[in-house]
Structures are given as C-alpha cells and as structure tokens.
Amino acid sequence: GRLKAVRAIGWYIDQYRQAQVSINLIDYKVTPLHVVFETVCEEAAKLGLRVTGSELVGLMPLQPLLDAARFYLGKQGKSAGVPEAELVELAIRSLGLDQLGPFDPAKKVIEYQFRSRGPLVSMAVDRFVDEVSSESPAPGGGSVSALAGSLAAALAAMVANLTVGKKGY
C-alpha cells in the first residue's frame, strides 16, 4: 500500500451514512501516527469527505502522541517546548481522538499505566514548603534544589515560547 508498516481497510456503513477506516499501525517509527492520520484526511478529501474523528482500541505508546503534537505545533509555527501533558492534549485534539468518545491518556497510554507518582511529586507546592520547614530531615536540600531547578527550566521555556516566531529575537 501507500504507507509502510500499516495495514488498513475501509468501508461504507449505510445506516450511519459514513465511511470507516480500520488501521493497524505496525511500526510508528516507520510510519508515524500523524502521517497515517494526515494521509487518511488527504484520501477522504479526494472523495469529497471529511475525517470526523478517530478512535484507539487498546493501548498505545506515548511517543507517537508526542511526535504528532510536535508535528502539529510545527505546522502552526509554534514552539514544541511545552509540558508533556500539553503535548498529549494537543495530539488528542489534532488527531480527533476525543471526537467519538472520551480519550483518557491515563487509561490509553502504556507508559501512564506504570507511572507511580510518589508523595513528593504529587504534593502541592504549599504543602511541599510546609514539609521542608518541618522537623523531618526529608525532603531536604536535594528536593528543594530539584524544585528550584525545574522552576528555572520552566521559566526559560516560557521565555523561549514567548519569542518563537517573533522577529527581533
């Protein structure tokens, strides 16, 4: 077919007056998810049709969503230096994964099935500050440094994102 590492079939469903394409993406590194989606959109447009959504059956790796988000941000001339959660949400919207029903990345992305958020990571900043000021030896300097470093990196990313695509920067 037109795309490598992709198996697809399409048909028309009379009762819904819509066409449907079923795709098995064998290797997203050979043919990225967004390339498959864009190709289906192109083929539909040739027939005077429009893609109205997509659906994922089962689980998927995180990387194809991140790649798709970066692709769509590039098309918009925007910086891809945004938080992972924002990239995932952009990919979900851009690929229409939330059009036919809810798409919960916590349930659909393989890596999110195995992530455990420890007590410090899931703690609100004000609670973290209170915990640092307590008599307990942990969290200590390392955790405080990690928070300060991550805030500095976030601020640098914000400045970069504010200047991307603007003349004079």
Please state what every model-predicted region is.
Residues 132-159:
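Conserved phosphate/anionic-ligand binding catalytic regions in large, soluble enzymes, centered on
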Residues 165-169:
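A structural-propensity feature for long, helix-poor, extended segments
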Residues 19, 156, 161-164:
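Ribosome-associated translation termination/rescue signal centered on the conserved GGQ peptidyl-tRNA hydrolysis loop
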Residues 59, 73, 144-151, 163:
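A sequence-level detector of short, solvent-exposed, charge-rich linear segments
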Residues 1-127, 134-135:
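Long, contiguous binding/interaction regions
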